[in-house]
Amino acid sequence: MAHKKAGGSSRNGRDSAGRRLGVKKFGSEAVIPGNIIVRQRGTKWHPGTNVGMGKDHTLFALVPGKVQFETRRGRDFVTVVPLAQAAE
């Protein structure tokens, strides 16, 4: 009798899609209110002046202006310099 032994099932072959995290607007780029600046897990970057933080730690602009990255007290902050000041 021609029988074929049952094939084993593989335990590999699956992976999750990338989460598209990272910096979306870099230093000195122009932003408008609501623009996402950084998507992150945890607070690698902290919100500075004129920057808000969502419940998933996403940083976003609160005013129109230019993005600025800076380090204060050993932490990395993202701030938005308002257009009036950025023009000066």
Curated annotation (Swiss-Prot):
<dbReference type="GO" id="GO:0022625">
    <property type="term" value="C:cytosolic large ribosomal subunit"/>
</dbReference>
<protein>
    <recommendedName>
        <fullName>Large ribosomal subunit protein bL27</fullName>
    </recommendedName>
</protein>
<dbReference type="GO" id="GO:0006412">
    <property type="term" value="P:translation"/>
</dbReference>
<keyword id="KW-0689">Ribosomal protein</keyword>
<dbReference type="InterPro" id="IPR001684">
    <property type="entry name" value="Ribosomal_bL27"/>
</dbReference>
<dbReference type="InterPro" id="IPR018261">
    <property type="entry name" value="Ribosomal_bL27_CS"/>
</dbReference>
<keyword id="KW-0687">Ribonucleoprotein</keyword>
<dbReference type="Pfam" id="PF01016">
    <property type="entry name" value="Ribosomal_L27"/>
</dbReference>
<comment type="similarity">
    <text>Belongs to the bacterial ribosomal protein bL27 family.</text>
</comment>
<feature type="region of interest" description="Disordered">
    <location>
        <begin position="1"/>
        <end position="23"/>
    </location>
</feature>
<dbReference type="GO" id="GO:0003735">
    <property type="term" value="F:structural constituent of ribosome"/>
</dbReference>
